[in-house]
Amino acid sequence: HSQGTFTSDYSKYLDTRRAQDFVQWLMST
């Protein structure tokens, strides 16, 4: 159960990272 929570939190973290990278890429273009 805790493993599933960790995995879901981790994918949320990755999504946030990806979104921030995307925004920075847009700004730098």
Curated annotation (Swiss-Prot):
**What is known about its induction?**
Produced in the A cells of the islets of Langerhans in response to a drop in blood sugar concentration.
* Disulfide bonding pattern of the chain: none
State the superkingdom: Eukaryota
Q: Which InterPro entries match?
A: Glucagon, Glucagon_GIP_secretin_VIP
- Localization terms from the record: Secreted
One Pfam family recorded for the sequence: Hormone_2
**One GO location term (cellular component):** extracellular region
Q: Under the GO molecular function aspect, what terms does this record hold?
A: hormone activity
Q: What are the protein's UniProt keywords? A: Hormone, Secreted
Described function: Glucagon plays a key role in glucose metabolism and homeostasis. Regulates blood glucose by increasing gluconeogenesis and decreasing glycolysis.
Q: What is this protein called?
A: Glucagon
Q: From which source organism is this entry?
A: Anas platyrhynchos
Q: Which gene encodes it?
A: GCG
